[in-house]
UniProtKB/Swiss-Prot annotation:
Superkingdom, taxonomy of origin: Eukaryota
Modified residues (Phenylalanine amide): 8
BP-aspect Gene Ontology terms: neuropeptide signaling pathway
Functional note: Myoactive.
Entry protein name: FMRFamide-like neuropeptide PF1
Record keyword Secreted present: yes
Family of this protein: Belongs to the FARP (FMRFamide related peptide) family.
Protein species of origin: Panagrellus redivivus (Microworm)
Length: 8
């Protein structure tokens, strides 16, 4: 549920 984990 964290869009930050898609930031890679």
């Amino acid at each position: 549920s964290d869009p930050n984990f898609l930031r890679f």
